[in-house]
Amino acid sequence: MVRKNQEWPDEGELIIGTVYKVLNYGAFAKLEEYHGKEAFIHISEVSSGWVKNIRDHVRENQKIVCRVLRVNPKKGHVDASLKRIREDQRTKKIQHWKIEQKAEKFLELSAKSLGKSLNDAYDEVGYELMDIFGDVYGAFETAADDGAKSLTDEGISQEWADAITEIANKNITPPEVHISGYVDIETFVPDGVDVIIEALKAAEDNGDEEEEIKVQCVGAPRYRITVKSTDYILAEKALKAAADRCIEIVEASEGNGSFLRELDS
């Protein structure tokens, strides 16, 4: 069960629950992110329309997303609403919850690699990761992108930072960014074909940089340059640099070149 770094939800917060009891006047749900806590949804908060039969809207064992209306820790009560949520908010909450379920599994794997339990992981590092990165998955993403040092710089122990980074590298694939631009190049020197070939090879030669660059002929004198990267800003820089390398060679041979980020429609 995904856990939160606080005992009770806040008013206005979206929560995930599993309905375990439905009565004529409302429904009760166990909260997935707050162990041992439950919420009550009054029939008036089930739907914005008239509810003739509450079971037409909610049933036992159903996963639901609610908005917290009131919290009374002394009485152990959480009142919630099903109707005060937009569909996009409901979808986003469910997606985030599923991601955090995955993150908890990563945390458990990290703990096992150290001979520890999931409870140990939460107590020693899990709640701290939530405070620092917003959620556990955010910590694993950071580790996958920037390495263990990104965790130790925030005060996470080297032991946990290494374990988390190892699991992150095995399970999180960096997102790919694909962008394209165009170069128009031409030269009329006798060895012009060789010049163009050299220019296109220069565009694709990215040295030791990680960005992958490919050039395709759209129809002479126009060529498409495509860049694949894990970072949009780096991709843009690589695209411009590739175009500049290409144009520089053509212009050095008494030719002309220009870069177009996008084509006119």
Swiss-Prot record:
Belongs to the eIF-2-alpha family. Heterotrimer composed of an alpha, a beta and a gamma chain. It holds the Pfam family S1. This is Translation initiation factor 2 subunit alpha. GO terms for molecular function: ribosome binding; RNA binding; translation initiation factor activity. PANTHER family: EUKARYOTIC TRANSLATION INITIATION FACTOR 2 SUBUNIT 1. The keyword Protein biosynthesis applies. Residues 12-83 form the S1 motif domain. Keywords: Initiation factor, Protein biosynthesis, RNA-binding. PROSITE patterns: S1. SMART domains: S1 (SM00316). eIF-2 functions in the early steps of protein synthesis by forming a ternary complex with GTP and initiator tRNA. Gene3D superfamilies: EIF_2_alpha, Nucleic acid-binding proteins, Translation initiation factor 2, subunit 1, domain 2.
